[in-house]
Structure formats: structure tokens, C-alpha cells
């Protein structure tokens, strides 16, 4: 019996840096008698000996993998054959601040230009104190900000007087009033409802949970439904909610607070049903913040404010780059070179 048995064998060769020696001729100008030097080749200007590929890799490994300077120095030596000190790593991050912040500003402008914006926040640590990391995102851009306050002024400053059509957020007070209207995160409401049920409410919370789950199920099917069908579903959900909220207040404390809040914010629950571009949760924001939570737990965050600024800008570049089909390394390298990472159109 004859035939062919084919299989693949995959391996990595030893990784070694490419070192390019630059020789620049120097002399004396015969006219003015001043010393002159030959210009440096483009991309090989004097300064740091490390090229953009190393800079992007260092930032990538530190930001996305939460590798400390000490471990990163050892990893670069043992895996990549590159001797680099912790001080040099810090210098790479410091130099990256200007181009990364510039790229982040472009990303922020893209978020502000969006009709639908989502936002969330989590705590951060800077110089041993509690700060806050905010994320503001659209379908095409994700912007991170690390600041010392959780107040609504953070968002007000970010928006620069611009008001999106719809603001997607949880019920935190600092998230209120930034859009023309709000879409409340139904995932957060389901958690609040679950808590009320566990606390003993057997009337309002279970019925409200059924309405929310029905709304979520409709939201998952929106792309396959006609506009007229969605309008009918929206009217039906409003009727169910009106009937539920026209009843007596619950006697259990957490259920009563939820009941009163829903009476106040009832208009903010089902906007997504007839707006396919509006999510029914702000889970995208929570996913965008999750790597930062891991980074905080692993590294205990930042010893200096500039480190927080670089991290937020790099996180914005990486997350936005992924929306546009770029890897973290590709997005960072483009941003460091001043190349746009967002596709136009």
C-alpha cells in the first residue's frame, strides 16, 4: 500500500535583535570653518538605541500582560537576547507619552462624534491613592481616562460641550445627563432585581425580571425583525411596565427603592428596542475595563501620574486598534509612528 502521510512541525528559531551600526562622516566646512556631520538615515536618528519595534513590544508586554519592569528586563534578555535595563524600559514608556496621548486625542474625538456613547468606570491606584479609570466608547473607538475623581465633571470635560443622542450607562449618578436621552444598562437592572428577590420580595421584583428578560430576548433578535414589529414589541413592553409600576409599592426595602427608581426612569429602559445601534447593556464598557482591573491587581497600578497617563493612552490605542482589525502590537507601532489606527469611512 502506498500513499502520503503529511504533517506539520512548528518551531521558533532563536530570537536575536538586529543591530545596525550607523557611521556618520564629520568634517569642517571649508567656507565657514564650522564642524558639520552627515545627516542620519531616516528612522535611524541618534538618541535611544532601541527601534520602534522594541518600543512597541515593551509597551505591549507591560500594558497588556502586566509584566513588571524587573521581569520584563529579564524576559527581553532570556527570550529575545536583548539586554535592556529597568531604567531604559521606564524611558521607553516616558518617551511614548507624547505620541500615545496624541493618538488618544484622535480616539476621543471619534467617540465625541458618535451618536451613541457608552461609559463606565472602575477604581485605579496612583501614588498609593484611589483614582478612577473611565472608559467612554462608541462602535468605532474606545477611550480610557485615568483621573483622581469619579464626579460627572470627568465626562463633562471629555465631551467639550457635545451631547450624544443616547448615553448608555448604569444608574450611577455621575453617568446621568450627558446624552440627550439615556439607555439604562439592563444587565445592572437584572442584578438589582436578583438582589431584591433574594432579599425577600416576591411580587414586584420577579415580575419586573420577566419584563427585563423579555426585553433582552427581543434585543438579541433585533437585526432579524422589521421596524414595525419592533415598534409593536416596544409598545407591548411599555404596557407591561406601566401595569407593573401602577401597582402598590413593595414593602421590602431594596424592592421599594428599585420600584421608585423605575417609576422615575421608566423612559430609559427600552430605547434600544427600536434603535438597532443602541446596546441594551453597557457590557462593552465592562469588557473594556476588565484588562485594567487585572493590571491593577497584578501591579498595584502606578507610582507616578505620567505612568497612569501613558497606560490610559496605550489602552485606548490597543482597544480601538482591535476594533479596526489590528493587533495590540500593530496598533501601538502605528500610534508611535503617528499613523492613524482607525479606518476612515
Where are the model-predicted features located?
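Short, conserved DNA-binding cores of transcription-related domains
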Residues: 1-30
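Catalytic center-proximal scaffold of phosphoryl-transfer enzymes
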Residues: 19-345
Amino acid at each position: 500500500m502506498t500513499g502520503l502521510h503529511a504533517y506539520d512541525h512548528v518551531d521558533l528559531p532563536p530570537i536575536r535583535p538586529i543591530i545596525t551600526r550607523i557611521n556618520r562622516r564629520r568634517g569642517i566646512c571649508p567656507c565657514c570653518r564650522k564642524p558639520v556631520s552627515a545627516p542620519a538615515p531616516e528612522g535611524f536618528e541618534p538618541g535611544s538605541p532601541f527601534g520602534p519595534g522594541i518600543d512597541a513590544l515593551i509597551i505591549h508586554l507591560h500594558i497588556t500582560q502586566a509584566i513588571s519592569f524587573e521581569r520584563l528586563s529579564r524576559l527581553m534578555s532570556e527570550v529575545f537576547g536583548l539586554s535592556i535595563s529597568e531604567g531604559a524600559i521606564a524611558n521607553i514608556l516616558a518617551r511614548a507619552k507624547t505620541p500615545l496621548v496624541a493618538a488618544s486625542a484622535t480616539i476621543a474625538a471619534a467617540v465625541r462624534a458618535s451618536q451613541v456613547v457608552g461609559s463606565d468606570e472602575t477604581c485605579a491606584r496612583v501614588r498609593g491613592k484611589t483614582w478612577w479609570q473611565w472608559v467612554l466608547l462608541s462602535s468605532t473607538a474606545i477611550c480610557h481616562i485615568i483621573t483622581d475623581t469619579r464626579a460627572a465633571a470627568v465626562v463633562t470635560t471629555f465631551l467639550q460641550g457635545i451631547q450624544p443622542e443616547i448615553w448608555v450607562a448604569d444608574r450611577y449618578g455621575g453617568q446621568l445627563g450627558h446624552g440627550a436621552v439615556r439607555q439604562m444598562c439592563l444587565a445592572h437592572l437584572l442584578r438589582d432585581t436578583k438582589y431584591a428577590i433574594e432579599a425577600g420580595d416576591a411580587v414586584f421584583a420577579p415580575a419586573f425580571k420577566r419584563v427585563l428578560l423579555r426585553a433582552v430576548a427581543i434585543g438579541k433578535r433585533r437585526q432579524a425583525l422589521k421596524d414595525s414589529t419592533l415598534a409593536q414589541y416596544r409598545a407591548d413592553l411599555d404596557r407591561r411596565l406601566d401595569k407593573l409600576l401602577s401597582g402598590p409599592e413593595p414593602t421590602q426595602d431594596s424592592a421599594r427603592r428599585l420600584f421608585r427608581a423605575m417609576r422615575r426612569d421608566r423612559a430609559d429602559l427600552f430605547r434600544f428596542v427600536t434603535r438597532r445601534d443602541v446596546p441594551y447593556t453597557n457590557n462593552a464598557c465592562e469588557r473594556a475595563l476588565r484588562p485594567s482591573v487585572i493590571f491593577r491587581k497584578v501591579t498595584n497600578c502606578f507610582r507616578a501620574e505620567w505612568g497612569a497617563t501613558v497606560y490610559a493612552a496605550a489602552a485606548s490605542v490597543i482597544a480601538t486598534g482591535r476594533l479596526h482589525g489590528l493587533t495590540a502590537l500593530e496598533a501601538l507601532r502605528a500610534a508611535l509612528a503617528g499613523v492613524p489606527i482607525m479606518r476612515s469611512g
